[in-house]
């Protein structure tokens, strides 16, 4: 992708989760870097080259009238879905462009403020709508979830089948939307509330992840694949690092990476340890988006700091991103969690002090998560990074996500 398009845009992402708590879509927000118009047509062509059939559905959400008009004019039926902001509908010529895009087969979505819904006359143009609930609507939905039979329809339900619900405040409301109201998806995930529900019952590793690792060991897969699978379960990875650095293991060297630990421990002892984790492991669907979000940030860091062929550096950068949110899974202060591991000053400095060589990339990976994208341009300038490189990297990581 050329700097002519990616260097003109500030991008941020938000995952949309389906009933199985898997990514149904990737919502990509875009704002202009400056007042001058961006080359939207080129950006759309480049997006289609990056996105694959294995990637989640892409929902493009322009946050300015010029970007939205450009997307409506140039998008194709096989391009990304286009999300239209309610507050941009009043722009001159916008409705006409929407009708023409709809006529070409472009999938349009509507998005508004809490409590808003699309005008009845405009509703036929939209394949789906993204709603935000008012506090009263969220309370009504939570009350229904607690008191009503899920098979009993209610005219007071603020969520209709097929809708996408944004900024859901609680785990209870997320379950109501996806499991009881047949919402198409949840935009963003109430991770803080899900973790808060574990205040008196610690989070446990994923049973599914442990089973997958055991199968891979039995199949004698490559060590790289084992390392990748272990890294996809942050809590299990943290416990593994604790294990390999414990006095009970008697290993002669400090273990600073998952791969190093696997090599020193050996697959037989690793398998035995996994079996010991099985009784406490759980399959808790609401935790999957939390884990995925942590791993996404880690992968963004890994790719933002282009380590080239330096695998050791790449692993340390990934570990930095993963451990930056481990406190939520452990239910304890981040400093306490990190001090139990023999981490380098580069890792500790980035996470605890926002200092050192990895800190800029941790800050950027966090800022790319909507709604923090307004900080991206300033961070690029502060740390002398190119915005087009940052955007290109983010899109590459997003496209690799499996739905």
Question: Model segments located where?
Answer:
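Bacterial c-di-GMP phosphodiesterase EAL domain
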Residues: 1-81, 86-100, 289, 307
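The catalytic core of metal-dependent phosphodiesterases that act on cyclic dinucleotides
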Residues: 74-192, 313-316
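Generic structural signal for short, solvent-exposed loop/turn connectors between secondary structure elements
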Residues: 31-43, 113-118, 131-139, 219-220, ...
């Amino acid at each position: 992708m050329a700097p002519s398009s990616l260097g003109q845009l500030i991008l941020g992402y938000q995952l949309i989760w389906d009933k199985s708590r898997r990514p149904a879509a990737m919502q990509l927000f875009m704002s202009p870097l400056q007042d001058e118009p961006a080359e939207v047509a080129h950006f759309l062509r480049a997006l289609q080259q990056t996105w694959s059939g294995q990637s989640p559905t892409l929902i493009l959400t322009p946050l300015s009238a010029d970007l939205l008009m450009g997307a409506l004019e140039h998008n194709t039926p096989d391009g990304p879905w286009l999300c239209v902001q309610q507050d941009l509908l009043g722009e001159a010529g916008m409705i006409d462009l929407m009708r023409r895009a709809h006529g070409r087969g472009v999938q349009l979505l509507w998005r508004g403020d809490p409590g808003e819904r699309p005008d009845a006359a405009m509703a036929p143009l939209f394949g789906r709508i993204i709603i935000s609930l008012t506090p009263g609507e969220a309370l009504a939905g939570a009350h229904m979830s607690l008191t009503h039979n899920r098979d009993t329809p209610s005219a007071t339900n603020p969520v209709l089948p097929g809708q996408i619900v944004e900024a859901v405040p609680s785990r209870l409301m997320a379950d109501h939307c996806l499991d009881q109201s047949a919402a198409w998806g949840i935009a963003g995930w109430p991770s803080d509330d899900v973790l808060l529900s574990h205040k008196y019952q610690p989070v446990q590793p994923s049973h599914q992840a442990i089973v997958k690792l055991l199968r891979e060991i039995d199949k004698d897969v490559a060590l790289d694949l084992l390392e990748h699978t272990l890294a996809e379960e942050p809590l299990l990875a943290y416990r593994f690092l604790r294990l390999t650095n414990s006095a009970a293991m008697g290993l002669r060297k400090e273990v600073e990476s998952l791969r190093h630990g696997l090599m020193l421990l050996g697959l037989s002892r690793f398998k035995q340890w996994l079996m010991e984790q099985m009784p406490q492991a759980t399959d808790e669907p609401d935790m999957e988006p939390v884990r995925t979000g942590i791993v996404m940030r880690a992968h963004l860091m890994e790719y933002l700091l282009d380590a080239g062929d330096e695998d050791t550096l790449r692993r340390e950068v990934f570990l930095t991103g993963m451990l930056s949110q481990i406190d939520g899974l452990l239910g304890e202060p981040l400093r306490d969690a990190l001090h139990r591991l023999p981490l380098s000053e580069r890792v500790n400095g980035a996470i605890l002090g926002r200092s050192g060589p990895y800190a800029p990339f941790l800050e950027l990976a966090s800022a790319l998560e909507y709604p923090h994208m307004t900080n991206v341009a300033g961070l690029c300038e502060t740390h002398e990074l190119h915005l087009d490189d940052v955007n290109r990297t983010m899109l590459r990581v997003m496209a690799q996500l499996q739905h």
